[in-house]
């Protein structure tokens, strides 16, 4: 690793993602090019084959719903028959046979969820490189504690496609505990309650000093973990969307869920209402011109109270209790044994969620961490440990689900029980089920069910050339090896001959090494083009806002101006509009500069022609000056977005 090079920490979230580093002993959350610390996990593909990532992608979702991909994390490492509820929640297409790994349909193209996530990771990587002033090659990336082997491997693949060596995959609650407990001096038992956009995790940890006088360090030991990878803030949004859409359908006979653009507007409005109801007793959803029928345009106006919202999400929030109680049971603890409850994830801001947490533990949760950023900060701390920058932290994580093989009768025989500390190696000796059997098939499963086929098949492989013998005589040793990332390798060896077969569970994410290498090359080859397209979109947004402001100014003062007064401005506006329709960035910027010059001249004419020179002239100069300066790009685009909505 290059001198001074950092291992960055990344929280790859369902809704938003965050990147952080350690500067000395202090964590630093790195802002993106838009100046925000949270980057929406959104990727959009325009009709002009442009790829947009993050906030700019989120802003254009209303007008481009079927080509805007969000919540891709819900589909990482998942087969089509595992995402039937999730695919109904998104406007873009989900493809693949029932047992196939999911692909995302955008126009005529298909993308794996790993490729979509890689575009988000690359943006975070570039943000870190811009901040640090040098290339970044390594990252610690977090995943939900309850992610299975396939989902972990898919996350690692996404990092590789983005051009990152994934130094470690760590669980989100564990990362949050690192950030929470690093500077604490006392020993304590904590529980991390992590409810994000698409997943729910809960982990019980013991945080203590190592007791080593020569090398004092803080030990973070995960005792147990549990969760639900089908539960999060997206589900809260969906509950509100369905309620509002059903009420609108009762009144108007139109189901907005069948109109992709209307549904996208409704989704954004409901997400906004959900956030507002965390601090307000009620809020309004106002969506003018949401649709139309033969009688004309229809408008959606509805008041939502916090009590109604809590009624809608009550069953979802109650689902949080089960994993919490299971984690406590696995840890051999009662709620009273927990010293602190640490809330992580934006969805924990919902008052109903906090009420449930308080009802379980009998006390208010700890509120001293930023729930949106704490996971990335913890990942950055682990990155600094792996980089050798600090040696005062020891992290002991666990595997969230039982791992085993199918044995006679279809039984699931466990080799690695859930909540086993990792890295771990476990082995057991098995034999044949029939006389003179010369080959066995090892089928590897993950899950808690007693019958193997009720669990998730990770892989299967054959061990052949076993010496013929009566059943029960051959000795076959099966070994499971789980690395620090929670990713599994399995081997089987016939002990008499030493004949061995093994498999690293890499196929679980449906990407081969050659797939990843090709996707990485494609991403690198298109990096400059992606950057150019991003700049092109930003330039178009800027000139569109310029035109809007100036046309508004001309309209407000139309009675004071002659056609000759307006001619130079109209010519400049037409020129910049034409330039914005094309793909020449230099031409757009040149036309924008000409428009700024024309706006300055126009403000002078308007000033001279206005009777109330002081007041009107100042207004005109202020408006034109704001336009000439370009304004704040974020504010400009937000305003445009709100008008569309």
From Swiss-Prot:
Source organism, top-level taxon: Bacteria
GO BP annotation list: chaperone cofactor-dependent protein refolding; protein refolding
Pfam families per UniProt: HSP70
Listed CDD domains: ASKHA_NBD_HSP70_DnaK-like
Compositional bias ranges of the Low complexity kind: 615-626
Induction: By stress conditions e.g. heat shock.
Biological role stated in the UniProt entry: Acts as a chaperone.
Designated name of the protein: Chaperone protein DnaK
Natural source organism: Rhodopirellula baltica (strain DSM 10527 / NCIMB 13988 / SH1)
């Amino acid at each position: 690793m290059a001198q001074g090079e950092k291992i960055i920490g990344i929280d790859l979230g369902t809704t938003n993602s965050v990147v952080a580093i350690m500067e000395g002993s202090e964590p630093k959350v790195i802002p993106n090019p838009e100046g925000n610390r949270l980057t929406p996990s959104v990727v959009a593909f325009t009709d002009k084959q442009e790829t947009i990532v993050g906030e700019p992608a989120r802003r254009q979702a209303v007008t481009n719903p079927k080509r805007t991909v969000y919540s891709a994390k819900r589909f990482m490492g998942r087969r089509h028959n595992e995402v039937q509820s999730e695919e109904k929640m998104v406007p873009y297409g989900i493809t693949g046979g029932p047992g196939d790994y999911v692909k995302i349909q955008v126009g005529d193209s298909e993308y794996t969820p790993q490729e979509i996530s890689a575009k988000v990771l690359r943006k975070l990587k570039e943000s870190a490189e811009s901040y640090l002033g040098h290339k970044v090659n390594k990252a610690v990336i977090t995943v939900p504690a309850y992610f299975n082997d396939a989902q972990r491997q898919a996350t690692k693949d996404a990092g590789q496609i983005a051009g990152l060596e994934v130094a470690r995959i760590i669980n989100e609650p564990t990362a949050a505990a690192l950030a929470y407990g690093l500077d604490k001096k006392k020993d304590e038992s904590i529980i991390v309650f992590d409810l994000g956009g698409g997943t729910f995790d809960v982990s019980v940890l013991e945080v203590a000093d190592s007791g080593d006088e020569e090398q004092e360090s803080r030990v973070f030991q995960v005792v147990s973990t549990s969760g639900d990878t089908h539960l999060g803030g997206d589900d809260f949004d969906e509950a509100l969307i369905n309620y509002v859409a059903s009420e609108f359908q009762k009144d108007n006979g139109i189901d907005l869920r069948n109109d992709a653009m209307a549904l996208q507007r409704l989704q954004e409005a409901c997400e906004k209402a959900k956030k507002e109801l965390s601090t307000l007793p009620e809020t309004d959803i106002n969506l003018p011109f949401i649709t139309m029928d033969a009688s004309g345009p229809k408008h959606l106006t509805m008041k939502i109270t916090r009590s109604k919202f809590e009624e809608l999400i009550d069953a979802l929030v109650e689902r949080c209790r089960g994993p919490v109680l299971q984690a406590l049971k696995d840890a051999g603890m009662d709620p009273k044994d927990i010293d602190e409850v640490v809330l992580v994830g934006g969805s924990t801001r919902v008052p109903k969620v906090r009420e449930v947490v308080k009802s379980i533990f009998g006390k208010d949760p700890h509120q001293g961490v930023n729930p949106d950023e704490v996971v990335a900060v913890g990942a950055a701390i682990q990155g600094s440990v792996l980089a050798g920058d600090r040696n005062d932290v020891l992290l002991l994580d666990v595997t969230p689900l039982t791992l085993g093989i199918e044995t006679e009768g279809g039984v699931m025989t466990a080799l690695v029980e859930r909540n086993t500390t990792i890295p771990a190696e476990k082995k057991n000796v098995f034999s044949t089920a029939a006389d003179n059997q010369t080959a066995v098939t090892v089928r590897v499963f993950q899950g808690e069910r007693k019958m193997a086929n009720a669990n998730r098949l990770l892989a299967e492989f054959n061990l052949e050339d076993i010496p013929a013998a009566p059943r029960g005589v051959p000795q076959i040793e099966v070994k499971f090896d789980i690395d620090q990332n929670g990713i599994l390798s399995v081997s089987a060896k016939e002990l008499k001959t030493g004949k061995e077969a093994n498999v690293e569970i890499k196929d679980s994410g449906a990407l081969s090494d050659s797939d990843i290498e090709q996707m990485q090359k494609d991403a690198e080859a298109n990096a400059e083009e992606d950057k150019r397209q991003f700049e092109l979109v930003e330039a178009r947004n800027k000139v569109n806002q310029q035109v809007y402001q100036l046309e508004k100014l001309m309209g407000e003062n139309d009675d004071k101006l002659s056609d000759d007064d307006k001619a130079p401005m109209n010519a400049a506006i037409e020129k910049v509009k034409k330039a914005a329709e094309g793909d020449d960035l230099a031409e757009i910027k040149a036309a924008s500069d000409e428009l700024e010059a024309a706006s300055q001249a126009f403000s002078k004419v308007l000033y001279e022609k206005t009777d109330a020179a002081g007041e009107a002239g100042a207004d005109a100069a202020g408006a034109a000056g704001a336009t000439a300066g370009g304004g704040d790009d974020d504010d400009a685009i937000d305003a445009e977005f709100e008008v569309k909505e």
